[in-house]
């Protein structure tokens, strides 16, 4: 397992199949595995304007920052896990994703909230940028980003939660044995999946179960 010093300083560090940027200079790693929360980005924390690759398109969803702040108060590790095929499609670069995450981290800080770890996958098999034009297990619904968060934050994935507004998010949760929250108007009838209209609405439910 990586130690905080091995993770290196922000904003970014490459992984063998994905990318990670740290909102905090270093993250505290617990001695024993613990539950964590893996959040999708667009449609969960910020408004999904479609391929958000610049800071001027970052808009917090109402109540999202407050929900994250509550997780922080409960000392529950929080990671962002987001597919960013816009990099592979040539719509924006990896540096642009880092800038968006740095900006998002600052916005959350003004609301007394923080993300412990940002993870994203820039790969897509139909990409036009050769470096990123390939399949990757880091791309949701693959397990790669969840496994990376597990290693970086010393998580117990079986006791952790994945929250997102797409079926890919639920697929990643199922791939690693985590519970899932689906954000949408049509509930998903699948084992260990609960549906809520927003992260803010789901937060008390998650906190109650993590505290058990």
Residue positions per predicted region:
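Short Lys/Arg-rich amphipathic alpha-helical segments
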Residues: 55, 65, 76-81, 91, ...
